[in-house]
Amino acid sequence: MANDYVSTVLLLLSLLIFLSQRTDSASIVKSLPGFDGPLPFELETGYIGVGEEEEVQLFYYFIKSERNPQEDPLLLWLSGGPGCSSISGLLYENGPVNVKIEVYNGTLPSLVSTTYSWTKVSSIIYLDQPVGTGFSYSRTKLVNKPSDSGEAKRIHEFLHKWLGKHQEFSSNPFYVGGDSYCGMVIPALVQEISKGNYVCCKPPINLQGYILGNPSTENEVDINYRIPYAHGMALISDELYESMKRICKGKYENVDPRNTKCLKLVGEYQKCTKRINKALIITPECVDTSPDCYMYRYLLTTYWANDENVQRALHVNKGSIGEWVRCYFEIPYNHDIKSSVPYHMNNSIDGYASLIFSGDHDMEVPYLGTQAWIRSLNYSLIDDWRPWMIGDQIAGYTRTYANKMAFATIKGGGHTPEYKPEESYIMFQRWISGQPL
């Protein structure tokens, strides 16, 4: 009898632990450690379980529009990597708070309000994906490692479950956005949602379009365009560039080992650019432990996100992850989409709007390569190359294509929106409102 009682108690305790870490938990966060006073916006955090057994627990941050959440667009924002936490988007790129940049003294870093949050005109879901990123985790060992196409399916499942629990947003115009490596996943996700709306999944998601910043599209092409970009930005000489064009014939990545002359020239190019910060070429290449380094904010974020009180406030499941890492590049991952261009083509044919933007000082994914794959779609122009303005100042350049695709540069911008927050916000606000840039 005693043994039966003990067994029953242990079973109940196990069940309680399971339920406490079970899927589809959501909590309202009214304050955050490091931020002075109550949050001036509505924040919800939680997990949505995906997979056959809901073994994958995807963590999200949801911030309601500060204007009119009942009618404003709903945006899903993904960070790149793969393996970079969506906290990158929330704290640096387009969210309503940021880490205060000050020398770390052993106490919790502070958070401050931002001026140009995209939540002024849209509600945003920031999602940690793939599993193993940020606060997302798996309750069991995965049978298959994450992949580009697999993530499109998982995120689609996440969205249906999230909207099922937030039905008040099911009729809002829905958009997907992200930058960097998300250029491989988001076009496939848009296609997955579009197909699901017709084939399997009710109610349909009110998908209207997508926005991508400095998006990866095809790895070899993206890298090959770094050479003409470096030449245009005076990082390599005319002579070296002309020699590379002639001998390498435009192929600078995965060079044929028999082409020793090309390999030598590529080596010369690398000597000229190895100390360049490719994310924003006008900033120093530096280590994040130096307070003078731009990336110091990432170190402060690591201290903040690993604090027990912060994780408690965010309602992170205790013990679900080890150390929080902003970008975990060691996630086992299958890069099974070699080019996202066909997905862009299909999404345009299906009538979805898209804005592709490039910081013109990004060398990770140079705007030259982005323009090249857009040209390959052979869309007719409806508004040719022109400056877009903020007040009387040029903020960048833009052109608009048929099939609802627009391209824009951000003058002086880098790999992500964080480097030019005002310009990025105004660009987004105009596009999401249906206005010309």
UniProtKB/Swiss-Prot annotation:
Q: Name one GO cellular component term.
A: extracellular region
Q: Per its UniProt entry, which superkingdom is the organism in?
A: Eukaryota
Q: Which UniProt keywords apply?
A: Carboxypeptidase, Disulfide bond, Glycoprotein, Hydrolase, Protease, Secreted, Signal
Q: Which GO terms describe its biological process?
A: proteolysis
Q: Provide the active-site residues from the annotation.
A: S180, D362, H415
Q: Which SUPFAM superfamilies match?
A: alpha/beta-Hydrolases
What's the main place this protein lives?
secreted
Described function: Probable carboxypeptidase.
- Protein name stated in the entry: Serine carboxypeptidase-like 7
Q: Species lineage, top-down?
A: Eukaryota, Viridiplantae, Streptophyta, Embryophyta, Tracheophyta
